[in-house]
Amino acid sequence: LVRERLFEHVAHTHGLDPLQLVIEDTDIVDTMGPLRISVSEASKGVKIVQTFLHQHRKTEELDENGQGNCHVAFAFVAHRAVVDVDVELGLVKVVQIATAQDVGRSLNPLALLGQIEGGIAQGLGLAVMEEIIVHNGIVKNPSFTDYLLPTALDAPNVLFIPVEEPDPQAPLGAKGVGEPPCISVTPAIVAAIRDATGVDLKRTPVRPQDICL
């Protein structure tokens, strides 16, 4: 909306059609003529006030069992994991995660990638590292010395393909992107380990003794 108002201002000032204006880097450019003016210069003295109200559509009613669908937007994602496994020591290195994900509309590509990589790191932790060990009601690994978290050294190479399917009922068509990787990265990694070792893995995280014993 701000961009449209700014285009209208520039078009009125220079006698142009606002539909032929685009933003390139930090400039407003006339696609049909020579005009190129910085956004900061074009916005000097311009006051734009815009109020926008968005309300999510209502979620479904609960059924007779007290259950219902609380989601207002759905995102779809696929993951493929590549792992190196030392079958004698039971050690696993997640080498690469390839993923394609429905992101709605990408509003900030760099932040989007950060969300994807963060979700992948969480899923990796659940797959091969993070576990609270309890014995007789006592947590045996109460510190980060014993409770292992993924670090930058554990992070795999990520191949990410965003699929933009804007949600027509969400602000700017955006969807949540950090949560889906947390869900499907874990089974992708476990499936890759199972394929590499032939071991029928039935729990997470996958421990060395699950592989080599």
Indicate residue ranges for each PLM-predicted region:
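C-terminal catalytic domains of large/alpha subunits in multi-subunit enzymes
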Residues: 1-213
